Every structure is written in C-alpha cells, then in structure tokens.
Amino acid sequence: MAKKTKAEDPKKRIITLRKEIGRHNDLYYKENAPVITDKEFDILVKELQKLESENPDLADVSSPTAQVGSDLSPQFSKFKHKVPVLSLENTYNETELSEWLEKTGIEENYSLEWKIDGASILLYYEKGKLTNCVTRGSGGIGDVVTENVKTISTIPHTLSEEMNLTVRGEIFMTFADFEEFNEEYGGKFANPRNLAAGSIKQKDPLDVAKRPLRIYVYDVYFSSSRKGINTHKDILSLLKKEKFPLAPDTTILTGKKLLREIESFRKKKDKMPFPVDGLVIKLDSLNLRESLGETSHSPRWARAFKFDALLKESTIEEIDFAIGRTGKVTPRAKVTPISLAGTTVTYATLHNQDYINQLGAGIGAKVLISKRGEIIPAVEKVTFPPKTIFVLPNQCPSCNTKLTKVDDSVDFFCTNRHCPERKLNQLIFFCSKKQMNIEGLGERQIQIFFEKGWVKDIPDLYTLEKYKPTLLELDGFGEKSVKIIFDAIEKSKEKDFRFTLPSIGLNEVGPKVTEILIENGYDSWDKLLTLSKSKTANEDLKAIHGIGPRTIEALLTHLKDKETLKLVATLKKLGLKFQADETEKSDLQPFVGQSWCVTGSFENFQPRDLAMDLITKHGGKKVTSVSSKTTHLLYGPGAGSKLDKATELGVKLVTESEFLDLLKQEGIAID
C-alpha cells in the first residue's frame, strides 16, 4: 500500500494515492489479480477523498474517486452504456451503515441481498429480444461479449413482451463447479472469481460453453416508462416473471430490521455455495432513488456492506523468500495446510521485515491467515508467539549477495544483477503476455530452460533453437508445443520499440514512459543514446510533460550503463527492433502542421487512440498534453483539465461529431 510519510505535502500524497489506486484498479478489474484486500483499498480511497475535499484546487475529474474501475480489453468491440454503470460505496461496520440509514431514512424499506464475487454484466433487450451482453467496462463504455454470455443457459433470449430494458447481473461459478473444472485443468486457476471474469473474455464462445458459468440478476434500468414499476420489489417480481435467475435470500425490510438481519447473513456466509464478499443494501422506492441521485462514482441510495476477510488459524512451519526481477525480497510463511475460502492454503505472505516485527512472527508461531479479498493468503495476526521473532538473513538466499535497503523503502533488495532468481524472473517478465508475449514460454518452461543452462539471459531465448533435439526428448515438449515456442520467439522480433524497451526491464521505463518518449521524437534507442551524450539531456527531458526527475535520472543512468548497452546491442544483432514502427501514411494529408491532443470518451473511437491514429496517418502530430504548441483538442464526455487548459490557451476545440464531419469532408473513412 501507499505508505504515508510524516508531514507529506498534500499534492504529492494525492498524486501518490491516485497512482496507487489506479494500479490496484487495474490489478483487480483487468488482471483479475488483486494484491490488497478490499478494506485496504477503501482506506486508500477514503484518504484520497479527504485530501481532495481539503484541497479543492487539486481536484481532477480523472481522479479514481470520480471514476469506476475499468475492465476494458482491446480485443472486443465497445458499447456505450445507456445509463452510467456505477460502483457502490463500501462500509465495513454497523455504525457506518446505521449512520447512512439514518440519513437516508431508517423507516424506509430497503432490499438486502448477497454481494456475489464474480463478473458484472449488463443484458440489453430491445423489443423483448436480447441484443447485447456488455461488461461494466469503464462505467460509461463496456466490452461486447454477447456470444460468450449467451452460452449461459439460464439467460432468457426473449421476453414475454416487447420491452426495452437493461438487466444487470453477476456472472459467477460455485465452489464445487470451480474445484471440478480446475482439477480437470491441472489446478491452473486461482479462484472462482478470476475464472468467471476471465471466461467471459475468451475469444471462442465454444470454449466459454465448456465452463460452468452461472448468473444471478439483481436490477433493471428502463429505457422509457417504468410501467407501474415503483419499487425494487416490483423489479424482482418482473425478473422472476420473465424467468431470470435470482440470488437466494434477497429480502425487503425496514432500515431498523435490516441492522438486525445482517448478523444472520453473516452466519450463513461461509456456508454459501458460491463466493460472496458482503451484502448490498438498496432503497426500495425508485422515486426516492431518483431524488437522492448519485455521485460520479456511486449511487447515494445504495451501500455495499463488506465482510472482513475470513480468518483461520495455522502454524508457521518455515519461512522462505521470493526474489523479484528488481531484486526485492519478499518473505513468505509456509504454514500447516488449511482450507480457506474454498481453497487449500500452504503459503502466506509476510510482506517485509517491518511487518514481521510488528506481528512478532517466527517459526512455530500460531497465526491467523486471511485470504486478502478471498484471493491472496496473508499472515494477519500472531495468536501464540514463537520462541524468537524471525529476522531476514543478511545475504540473498539465491546468490549470497548482501541485502540492502534502497532509499526509504521498507523492503530489502538483492543488488546483484546476476542473481539467478532475479535473472529467472526477468526472463519470465520479458516473455509475459503484456511484454513480448512469447506464447508457450510460461514460468514452468522458462524455469526448465534456465536450470539446464540453455537460457541464462534474454538474448539466449533467440539462440534456443540449437537445443531443439535435446528439448524434444523432454517430457511435455512434443513437436507441436516446441514449434509454437519457436514460432512465437521469431514472431516477437516483429514487435517494435513500444514493446522492446519496456520489456528489458529498465527501472522507471515502462510502457507509458516509452510512449511519451516516442511522442516527443525519441522513437529509437539510437536517438536516446544521442540524447544522453548531450550536455542539455537533463533539461531536454525535463521539458517533456509526464517524465519526472526520478525517471530522468534512471533513464540517463541506463543509457550509460555498460551492461544495458551490451544487452541492447546484442538483441539488435539478433533481429529485435529498437526503433518505433512508422505510422502508416495516407496520400490524404489534411492534418499536416497540426498538433492534436485528445481527452474524454467517444462513441465511435474505442479506444480513443483510434482517433489519434487517423490524425497521424493523415499528416498530424499526436501530443499527450495541451500546450501553446497544441493546435487542436478533440474532446468528449469526461473531459477534464486538458479542456480547461485548451480553452485558456485558445486551442481549437473539436467535438466528436465535428471530427466525424471533418473526416467526411476530407474523404477519410473510419476503419
């Protein structure tokens, strides 16, 4: 989590929190791999909300407090939701909930229902026919996954009347179905929530149909008149009449009775056949809902009551360490196996030495284990102390290098760049889907090649074929799988600077920094090398919006580092591209001499970079920030500070409809 330092400047803390919350949103919604609990996440959000309210001059519509997390994926077509799909504000105790009920109306009726831990989905019906199934996405725009969702047999494809409405539900998997499916596939999936969320994003509906997905629906948005539907109870009756599957135990009761009923739900939680992480409480009256309205992030008429993470006792048997690709050392406890949230837990994270000291943890200690967000096992509390508190060794367990702390970090690092475990994790990172995407080279395969000495560093991947005869003799490496690996390695050479630079794992140089460098003319390794030799390198980089002092220092250090220079030179000789591919140019060049920036969301350009691609293809220049040199700003709903700055500077403002008219006038077709 983003750790607060004493007397930290509010502006710096706000920036830190926004970045940290954005990272955790991506891990949860896009990667299905959260690393903190929901409660820890909400603590960060509440701190940011407080700071933003105390410092209104630092408000920003792009702040995560003004948006919902996004699960948008580039491979799916996009759909603009007819009503914003908001998230719920969370509460973790009865006192907070009681205060909200008093404010909203303690005597009013509320619905109380399970909060299922799955994947949110919206079912769009036009004239009674199911036309689109769409993920929540960013809240304004979602991914169209219609054919995948239609494989769930309990979803009605036709309603009894020609109604136009949107049904919201949650796609999930029961614990029993998950265990059976996961066993069949070698235990490769972490939990039901991840598998359900990943399943609806599969490319082939036939693959989705093999997965035991289920759905419960819980709300309806009406396109026009509600036709006598005045309460949530009426909505549930309509859904039941149309034969939609509804979650068990949903009840309507007054605010006073609701507080008493929560305890009975809490007792049932661990016996539920599907994953739940809390309760949803909503005002029953739709008219009252409309009068209360919503914020940009959540409705004022609903709350999520989140259960604290499930805890179980176990004993620490051993403590070992993971060494990441950056050298960060993470201790983890091997514990007596326990069953927790439907899975067997044998390891739990201990984070760092400071955390171990705070807990008083060590070998032999009895501890409480939680599954963070019911996903990440962690040691939460010591219930019976060990003989001695565990102390990290002074030396790296992989290479015996002395461990050190970097700057003010609470973590220890192995600084040996040739540490075997660091090298192994660098290789895994390089081959991963988000980096060079070398199919067939997962963690297991890379570890085998690494242990055999075939692949010790990134360049060795591109000479691996010399071991092909021996490789084919290994169990699990047939002709077909080996061909996939070598084809993928060769195909990775087609990736340009946008991928090669961030994939080699240079500290502070990720995809975003790489894109900013390219946009500002540093579109190759050679140009960066030339820059590094300039006396004005520091000043030139400082002039680029989006690149801070820490990144500048790291980048210039990398560009003078002998090992980094040797690595890139070797990879270039092996055929990898360290220059950005030129954007395809058209004979039509109406945007020559123009610099365009983009902000907001768009109906016809999803993602919005598609609009910028058209501009660069037809002679224009794309910029990431508004300045006096910017000639045009293309803006849509949700435009923030860029629109204000462009207005102040007199930059020409262009709406989506105006942009479409301009393209039409110039004879430019949208691909």
Swiss-Prot record:
Chain sites annotated for binding NAD(+): D38, K39, E40, F41, D42, S87, L88, E113, R136, E170, K282, K306
GO molecular function: DNA binding; DNA ligase (NAD+) activity; metal ion binding
One Pfam family hit: DNA_ligase_aden
EC number: 6.5.1.2
Positions of the BRCT domain: 586-671
Enzyme class: ligase
One Gene Ontology biological process: DNA replication
InterPro entries xrefs: BRCT_dom (IPR001357), BRCT_dom_sf (IPR036420), DNA_ligase (IPR001679), DNAligase_adenylation (IPR013839), DNAligase_N (IPR013840), Hlx-hairpin-Hlx_DNA-bd_motif (IPR003583), NA-bd_OB-fold (IPR012340), NAD_DNA_ligase_OB (IPR004150)
Active site, per annotation: K115
Residues where Zn(2+) binds: C396, C399, C414, C419
The reaction(s) this protein catalyses: NAD(+) + (deoxyribonucleotide)n-3'-hydroxyl + 5'-phospho-(deoxyribonucleotide)m = (deoxyribonucleotide)n+m + AMP + beta-nicotinamide D-nucleotide
UniProt family annotation: Belongs to the NAD-dependent DNA ligase family. LigA subfamily.
Function summary: DNA ligase that catalyzes the formation of phosphodiester linkages between 5'-phosphoryl and 3'-hydroxyl groups in double-stranded DNA using NAD as a coenzyme and as the energy source for the reaction. It is essential for DNA replication and repair of damaged DNA.
Protein name: DNA ligase
Gene for this chain: ligA
